[in-house]
Design a protein with these regions (language model features):
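Active-site neighborhood of HAD-like aspartate-dependent phosphohydrolases
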Residues: 1-41
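Generic structural signal for small/hydrophobic residues in well-ordered secondary structure
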Residues: 8-11, 51, 108, 132
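Helical cap/lid subdomains and adjacent loops of hydrolase enzymes that gate the active-site channel
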Residues: 31-48, 78-90
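A metal-dependent, Asp-based hydrolase signature
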Residues: 46-78
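Short, acidic loop-to-helix structural element flanking the phosphoryl-transfer center
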Residues: 73-107
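Short, conserved loop/helix-junction motifs that constitute active-site signature segments
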Residues: 100-101, 124-128
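Distinct, well-ordered alpha-helical segments
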Residues: 117-123
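Conserved small/polar residues in nucleotide/adenosyl-binding loops
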Residues: 137-138
Length: 138
């Protein structure tokens, strides 16, 4: 019988859908695609996920790319507001509460960067976890 359940954050406990975020903000397919490529689809975003670059370094490079593509406004908007797309997945949290009440121990395993992890620790559901591992902590 299982006693421990492991959850990821992005796309499980919190929603992460950059394309919807871009559509809600810009409603222009070309702007959305170019901005996606510069931010969420970039090597810098992957490097940030791997913990080999800081948010400041990644942002600087992305803004330089944005300047060349004439997308500074869009990219800066993403860099300033992307956290807002990390809405709590209420269904997952309900399941977590039921599992906890049934005696299961809950853990997280994630690669979310430090600044995001710090913000998630403030959410009311974070205390449901008995522990966890953040694979990077830059």
């Amino acid at each position: 019988m299982y006693k421990n359940i492991i959850f990821d954050f992005g796309g499980v406990v919190v929603n992460f859908n950059p394309r919807d975020f871009l559509m809600d903000h810009f409603m222009n397919r070309r702007a959305e695609e170019e901005t996606y490529d510069i931010v969420f689809g970039s090597q810098e975003w992957q490097d940030l996920d791997r913990g080999i670059i800081t948010r400041e370094e990644a942002n600087k490079i992305m803004l330089e790319k944005a300047a060349h593509a004439n997308r500074v406004f869009e990219v800066q908007t993403c860099l300033d507001e992307w956290f807002t797309m990390l809405e709590t997945n209420k269904t997952t949290v309900q399941i977590m509460r039921k599992l906890k009440a049934a005696g299961y121990r809950l853990y997280y395993l994630t690669n979310i960067p430090t600044d995001v992890m710090d913000e998630l620790r403030q959410r009311e559901w974070f205390s449901l976890f008995d522990g966890g591992i953040c694979l990077l902590y830059t």
